[in-house]
Amino acid sequence: MSETTGLPLKHLQGSPPGTPVNTNNESNEASPDDGCRLPDTVTEAEASSDNHGSVLGDNNRNVEVAVGASDNATKQKVYHTGWRLHALTSALCLSLLLSTLETTIVSTALVSIVDALHGFNMAGWIVTSYLVTYTGFLIIYSKLSDIFGCKLMLLLAITIFTVFSMACGASDSMVPLIVFRAFQGMGGSGIYSLSTIMVPLMVPPEKYATYISIMSSTFILSSVLGPILGGAITDHTTWRWVFYFNGPGGALAAVLLAFSVPFNFPYGESDRFFHSLASKQMWKRVDFVGMTVSLAASILIIFALEQGGVAYPWGSGAIVSTFVLSGVLWIAFIAWERLLSKRDGVREPMFPWSLVHNRFVMGLLLNGFFTGFPFMAALINIPQRFQTVNMTSAINAGIRTLPLLLLSPLATAINGILVSKLRVPPLYTLFLGGSLQTIGVGLYSSLKSSTSIASAQYGYEAIMGLGFGFNLSTILMMVPLVVTEKDLAVTMGSVTQIRVLGGTIGLAVCSALLINHIKREAVKFLTAEQVAQILLSSENIGMLSIETQSRTRVLYADAYSEQMRVMLYFSIASILSLVLLVERQPRKAPAKPERAG
């Protein structure tokens, strides 16, 4: 038996829930629970006693039908094909692109924003307010999609994100902008969470690796493009377009989503969906206590990580008490989820306790957490190093990160082929990604402290990019192989949330390392006032004498290398976490079923 949920390992390897079964029988009957069939879809037939489904015809042609587990065995999953699949994929990619851009695009637009709104002392909150809600709502959206449906929750997320993006662009002072950014992050969180959850529900299992590679490539591309686009916008037009361009993009994504899938996704049309939505029984399923506690715990820890060493010293009462309170709330959340999981009631726990006993889930969570550290550190700090140490512009710094930008999506595409076409066990590609990531980070940390750019630096970026590409896509590919369908959404949400949390902690660690290194070493040749000025803004380095400027930039190079050396330890930890995923016969992506006769 598998150590996951009591399912036979063979079932998980070859035929996970929802695996399509081909047949040549034809019928135009639709299940009562499914409502009407949509054109350009492939339906999942109702399971019979011999585990073979009845077949649905589609315009006198044979179609694939699927039999699998769901919360209600009478529901039939409808896979998308044709224009509906292309429209849905476009909607997911576009919305994911926009929401992910917003996590990094303000990094190069920040100076222009605070100068225009006269709020330099509140600049950090433009980033923090987005991150606290972006991180806190990931698992909440995942669980609510189980209850209220993916389409409704994603439309809600896109609407919130788009409306408050426009509000951010129209802001005339810092306080409204910070508040609107928090709501924008709430919408962006739902987009990120649901775009990964919907992939295994919209295509058959054998196509999942291909489509998750598309989503992972979009995520990585947008993460790296953010600073480049932010710099280009602020250099050639007003900073307000950093937010305004989400308006038409968000509207287009919402329209594509609205017309490509039914509200009862992935189970086809149903005239009972909105009636069920209004029922008290459905609302009783929501774990309001777990949602509130997990959200508060996430917000507090992100606040402490973002503001520690910036607005408040790390040892201050504000930061220490925030960390302690967050820890207490996380303990309370764990205790509540365990209690709720043991109850035989209607309310569904945010994080089912059975997943804690699943070593594969724990392995994926640990791997995602540790991978988040070097991933975000590389995305943010490599462009900063080019700007601060090598004196390049924001756009030029972005261009110099192209090896990282281009190789990551390439790795996800290769990974999709390896896992889905060649059926290489995802564990192997995860180990490959972790190894490349570790080698790349290690080599980058060995760069000489100099204001000149070593050509080898681009090679190190490429190696890191390949590692990140393999890692980030494989983690999501493995989730459907280690959990049942009823736990798929919450596990996906947990993996994405803990990866974002790891990245946020990684950035906080890097910031602390840089500040401490500069404070410790710069006092040897700068006054206390000069040290404070260069920590306030790296642009102030230009106010120093020529000789001191060069020495200061070399000092920053030392600090950036130290950051990567520490990130190397987390990369190694991500490889060690794979021990929890090891098994005698590593599971593979399901093979495409052969058509009968």
Curated annotation (Swiss-Prot):
One of its GO terms (cellular component) is plasma membrane. It is a multi-pass membrane protein. Pathway: Secondary metabolite biosynthesis. GO terms for molecular function: transmembrane transporter activity. It is found in: Membrane. MFS-type transporter; part of the gene cluster that mediates the biosynthesis of the gamma-pyrones fusapyrone (FPY) and deoxyfusapyrone (dFPY). This is MFS-type transporter FPY5. It comes from Fusarium mangiferae (Mango malformation disease fungus). The lineage of its organism: Eukaryota, Fungi, Dikarya, Ascomycota, Pezizomycotina.
